[in-house]
C-alpha cells in the first residue's frame, strides 16, 4: 500500500513532538496526547480521540495515519504460542507470542530476512531484503496487543516482555531500533520496564558501541561456539568481529547498564556433535571467566533441509552439568511453538531475497557463507 501520509508510528516521543511543532504547527502536548491514544488505547482512528479538537483531527486525517503491519496469517500451537505472519509492504515477517502464566513475551522481528547467514538458522536461509521501519517494529507489538486484547478490555497487560529475537539482526538496523526501544520504554508508549525488553545480537560490535550510555535494556548475545575457528564456520559475522572483540564490548555495555544487573545472557544453540561435547563446555567456561554471564542453552530446533540435529538429552545434560561445575547459572530453554515452526531459529516469513541465497539453494548448490554488505546496512541504506 502506497501512501503520502506520514505514519505517526514512525516517531518516538521526541520525533513526534518535533513533527507536531515543525510540520503541523501544534504544541508539544498535543503530540503526547496522540501518543497516549496510539499506545495506551490502541487507537488508529483520529475521530475517536475525543480530547483532540475537531480542527486538529481534520488536519491529522489529511496529513497523517496510524498504520501498523496487519496479520496475514495466524498459527496456534498446542502450548498456547501464537505465530503471526505480519504483512510489511509486499512481504511478511513473523512475530511470536509466548504466554507463560502472568507473563506474555512477544518475539519481534527487526529485518525482512537476515543478512548474517548463520548456518543453523532457518531465517538466514531465506536471504535478506531490507530493514524494518520503526512503525513496522513497534507496529508488531501494537498489532499483537490488539489481537490479544488491550489492557482496558481485559484488565491485564497483553504484552509484558519484548525480545528482539525474531527475524533479522537488530544491531544492523540501529537507525530504527533506537527509536523503537524508546517507544517500548516510554510511559506514553508501551511503558515496559528496561529489564523486560531484551535485545539479542550475533556480534555487531559497532551497533553495541552505539548503545552504550544511550539505551539501557537487557542484552542477550548469540555466541554458539567457544572458539573463533568453530564460530566462524557456523557464524560468518565472527570474521568481522571475533569473540574477543565481541566480549570486550559486551563487558563495557554491561558495566554501563542497570537493566542487566551486572551480567549478560549468553545464548548457545546446541548442535549435535558440532559444539556440544564436554570439551566445548570447558572451553566455553574458560572463555567466559572474565565476563559475568548466565548461560541459556538452546537445543537445536530442526527445520526442513537443515544439516544439523538436536543433541540427545544425555548430551544436553552433560553439557549443562559441566558448565555448572564452573559455577555458572545455566538454563535449558524449553522449546515453545515448535509444532508451528515458531521456535528459536525456525522463523522464515515471506522474503524477496536480495542476497540470491535462496536461488543458490534451489539450484542444489552449497549456500555461500558470505555476509551481505554490512556497511550498507549500518549506514541505513537498506530500508
Swiss-Prot record:
Q: Which Pfam families match?
A: Radical_SAM, RlmN_N
Cystines in this chain? 107-344
Q: Where in the cell is it found?
A: Cytoplasm
Is Ligase among the key words of this record? no
The protein's matches in InterPro entries, at most eight in alphabetical order, are given as: Aldolase_TIM, Methyltransferase_A, RlmN_N, RNA_MTrfase_RlmN, rRNA_lsu_MTrfase_RlmN/Cfr, rSAM
Its keywords, alphabetically, are: 4Fe-4S, Cytoplasm, Disulfide bond, Iron, Iron-sulfur, Metal-binding, Methyltransferase, rRNA processing, S-adenosyl-L-methionine, Transferase, tRNA processing
Which cofactors go with this protein?
Answer: [4Fe-4S] cluster
Q: Which GO terms describe its biological process?
A: rRNA base methylation; tRNA methylation
Q: Which residues form the Radical SAM core domain?
A: 100-339
What does the entry list under GO cellular component? Answer: cytoplasm
What residues make up the catalytic site?
Answer: 94, 344
Q: Which residues bind S-adenosyl-L-methionine?
A: 168-169, 200, 222-224, 301
Provide any one GO MF term from the record.
Answer: metal ion binding
Instruction: List the EC numbers from the record.
Output: 2.1.1.192
Chain sites annotated for binding [4Fe-4S] cluster = 114, 118, 121
Principal place of residence: cytoplasm
The note on the cofactor says:
Binds 1 [4Fe-4S] cluster. The cluster is coordinated with 3 cysteines and an exchangeable S-adenosyl-L-methionine.
Q: Which CDD domains match?
A: Radical_SAM
Query: Can you state which reaction this protein catalyses?
Result: adenosine(2503) in 23S rRNA + 2 reduced [2Fe-2S]-[ferredoxin] + 2 S-adenosyl-L-methionine = 2-methyladenosine(2503) in 23S rRNA + 5'-deoxyadenosine + L-methionine + 2 oxidized [2Fe-2S]-[ferredoxin] + S-adenosyl-L-homocysteine; adenosine(37) in tRNA + 2 reduced [2Fe-2S]-[ferredoxin] + 2 S-adenosyl-L-methionine = 2-methyladenosine(37) in tRNA + 5'-deoxyadenosine + L-methionine + 2 oxidized [2Fe-2S]-[ferredoxin] + S-adenosyl-L-homocysteine
Query: What's in the misc comment field?
Result: Reaction proceeds by a ping-pong mechanism involving intermediate methylation of a conserved cysteine residue.
Family the entry assigns? Belongs to the radical SAM superfamily. RlmN family.
What job does the chain carry out? Specifically methylates position 2 of adenine 2503 in 23S rRNA and position 2 of adenine 37 in tRNAs. m2A2503 modification seems to play a crucial role in the proofreading step occurring at the peptidyl transferase center and thus would serve to optimize ribosomal fidelity.
Q: What name has this protein been given in UniProt?
A: Dual-specificity RNA methyltransferase RlmN
What species is given as this protein's source?
Aliivibrio salmonicida (strain LFI1238)
